[in-house]
Amino acid sequence: MPIDKDIKKVLIIGSGPIQIGQAAEFDYSGSQACKSLREEGIETVLVNSNPATIQTDMDMADTVYTEPLTPEIVSEIIKKENVDAILPTMGGQTGLNIATGLGDLGLLDGIKVLGSDIQTIKDVEDRDLFGHFMDKLNEPIPKCHAVESVEEAIEAVKDIGYPVIVRPAFTLGGTGGGVAYNEEELIEIATHGLDMSFINQVLIDESVLGWKEFEYEVMRDKEDTCIIVCNMENIDPMGIHTGESVVVAPAQNLNDRDSQALRDASIKIIRALGIQGGCNIQFAVNPETGEYKVIEVNPRVSRSSALASKATGYPIAKISSKIALGMTLDEIKNDITKETPASFEPAIDYVVVKIPRWPFDKFRGINREIGVQMKATGEVMAIGRTFEEAIQKAIRSLDMGHDGFEYVEYTEDDLANPTDERLFQLYSAIKDGMDLDKIQKLTNIDKFFLYKIRNIVNFENEVTEEKLNDADFLRKAKQMGCSNKRLAALSNQTEEYIRNLLNRFNIKQSYKMVDTCAAEFEAKTPYYYSTYDSGNELKSSNKKKIVILGAGPIRIGQGIEFDYCCVHSSLALKDEGIETILINNNPETVSTDYDISDKLFFEPITFEDVMGIIDQEKPDGVIVQFGGQTSINLAVPLANAGVKILGTPYESIDGVEDRELFAKLLNKLHIHQAPYGTANSFEEAREIAERITFPVLVRPSYVIGGRAMEIVYDNNELEKYMKEAVKVSPEHPILVDKFLEDAIELDVDVLCDGEEVFIAGIMEHIEEAGVHSGDSACVIPPQTIPEHILNTIREYSTKLALELDVKGLMNIQYAVKLDEEMVYIIEANPRASRTVPFVSKAIGVPLAKVATWIMTGAKLKDFNLTKEIKIDHVAVKESVFPFLKLPESDTVLGPEMKSTGESIGVDENFGMAFYKSQLAAGMDLPKEGKIFISVKEQDKKKIRPIAEKAANLGFELAATSGTADAAKGVDIEKIKKVSQGSPNIRDAILNKEIDLIINTSEGKQSAQDGYIIRRLAIELGIPYVTTLSGARAALNAIEAVQNNEITVKSLNEHIDGE
């Protein structure tokens, strides 16, 4: 059936910044939707405020907006662009909330809603409507009451009984949810949940804790044809959010009867809802009786549908987009086989395992338990012929230094109340001989999975050097998924020894295809996974070919920005007719889409796994510049193995990581650096700190995202850091730098071809020095730096890029002391940085593509990139933080990175651009009301001008007595600290009397008062800033929005002046 002729122009709503519960999977789905609609001749308009996405590239949609995602702003875009329809189902929970918001405001008259209509969204998101709907279908759901007050919640439990699951309606990743075992817990969780909910509603669910959880991905078209794309089994039982659970596909523990029952229910539900496109349905199954209940229906593409797409090779988002236009499944071709229609259900003859990646390494001291609220930032996926092989590959893919299962300390309580170490604790308990029945009782994990882990334990117990010299035993070890490093550790040998044994016995990886059809039809666009079974399906060509190493799972410090660069690199090579081979293991991202590269390998990014591919493909070179620290860490071992590293010489990469070599280089170039030292012990660190004077910045060498980095102000803090945060040794020294107080930091991205340097972007940080560059807001062009200082920065950047023989991208961070007119270099990274997508969007140049072309021999002059581009607009990048999902975390920013994603604001002036960036990041700055101010001692001398400006903008002011005294002459109401008794600032915040909070803190050991204030701001959604520079920028933004209407302008208009 042809597409709906009334639809000529469609607005695709993106999901906004990466956050816990809503990550790269929606860039993947949105990008697929853009491509899919354009293939059918539809004009596409995209709105998404995340600059790090592929979908916000100007060649992805006909028109791209990076405006904040609010119903009011999206409605302005709908009016301006005169679209016929909107597609909200590619934008996650954000997309659905925008659609329902537009509908409720009456702003969708005459506009078609594609995929799932507004009533369908409400039928599944509003729990009362969902309950009635399922009752009509005779489908069982857990008893549930939707309540709008704590009193109603207490009443609901009388019908259901404890324990209950408390979940806010219309939220993401279980935000604000929890399990209540008694009334006290119920009151606490329900109060918080009501504040979190988009519609001020909390769901009180009957507990099915301990039941098994299964998910079904279903597709339906307008002719009522339905297929099951994939079923998946959560290894963890109900009570652990599916985003927190280890997941396996296909489901391993469903008998034919139960499988058919869940399949029938899935098809019945999608038909009754009338969804056209993809839908995710979650079931709980009682392990004793086989009874099932429907837990949730997502009428949109989701994290699970991205996983199902990558696990099967069936592009759910792409096909959903075509169905939304009116096409039917039998009209849509399967892109992998090019023969079968999309109405053929995928068949898989392998096992897929997904493991979440948590951010607990960045938030020391917080509760690591996993449960109904999502905390993971990303995930990895691995494919094997057996569960044992797939799970061991997935563990390696996490990029956390694990070469396989590892023994950890645990208690029975840990097994009953799982943390991020769940898999290792299971392994350790089995290794210690704990009875599997007991483990099953404590964990509610199906014995099937416990047997599988026991297989690995038993096999490892047999490993000795002697046994490994038996070819059959060694082959079995590899078929179990054991890495060379793990086998070396178990046999007290080296990785090289194991590699030599494998060569001697001619035991090599064979590569199998993901082809959607279990090899029934020939795959035209295959992707591969490794195994040690017989039969290699990899066909190597004689073309020129290049390997690109991906960035692995999304984590704090290494986000979607690096995947963006990998995608651009692959597309650039394809443009040149070079065969591209991409290695990655992240199921959420665009880079692991089957049509981005010529060959995709879903593999761990380790030396062993990468070399396996290189040995068989024999590429002309490997690009390590774009995969963050994950791929950079492989540069030296790969080069030592004789692999050609393209672009910047690996000696230069290593040279800037080595402090002594880098210092010598800077001296040679007459570039200033803050005083520093390298310590191998606490005594050495203390001597350095006393020589260069406190405060000092301390950190381990070789890190990304500032992991375990702190500013310390005295010897006591230094000693605490050395004892608690790091293990120091001659192999792992500590870097001690003089901390430059009151400096302004800048980031510079440059392109270099070895002869010329192009300054792509100089970004001024909004936050003061000491806040990690990945957490600070930044602006292009710089707003407060004099031209002669900028010229010094340009000169330093050019000298450094040429001296290091950079071929491609480099990022350099500077600190400027304006009072001394001094420019200091903080660090240089001869690779793509997390700011590359932002700068690319701000100036309209695809930096990662150009960097790739340079690596293959092009020159900057070929692209007319010899002069810095002057832009007429202002672009601001703001960071987005996971504090709401991590209840014990403090919002104070420092040298260790905490943000998960970013937003962009673009306008003609700084104030409005900053306002848009804040709104896009979820910080709705007030135009009027009351501002509370409380600042640390050293900020008091600078607070008066800020207070004056706030008063002049018409705000009432309240402050603690010390801060109020420091701003003498400004009308400020004095308010008690929490520790001084009531009524105090906590009462004022809880009574919703405060509209903006300015609160700066005394370094690491922030006062309890400050923590309470900042935490309350997060919980209640009150805008807050934790630095004076942030406060100045916020007031500039408020002034701009008080005096001007917010206008919408596409990126195309900003860049091309259209």
UniProtKB/Swiss-Prot annotation:
Mg(2+) 2 binds at E296, N298. Mn(2+) 2 binds at E296, N298. GO terms for biological process: 'de novo' UMP biosynthetic process; glutamine metabolic process; L-arginine biosynthetic process. Pfam families: CPSase_L_D2, CPSase_L_D3, MGS. Residues 400-538 are annotated as: Oligomerization domain. One of its GO terms (molecular function) is carbamoyl-phosphate synthase (ammonia) activity. The large subunit is composed of 2 ATP-grasp domains that are involved in binding the 2 ATP molecules needed for carbamoyl phosphate synthesis. The N-terminal ATP-grasp domain (referred to as the carboxyphosphate synthetic component) catalyzes the ATP-dependent phosphorylation of hydrogencarbonate to carboxyphosphate and the subsequent nucleophilic attack by ammonia to form a carbamate intermediate. HAMAP family: CPSase_L_chain_A (MF_01210_A), CPSase_L_chain_B (MF_01210_B). This is Carbamoyl phosphate synthase large chain. The lineage of its organism: Archaea, Methanobacteriati, Methanobacteriota, Methanomada group, Methanobacteria. The gene is carB.
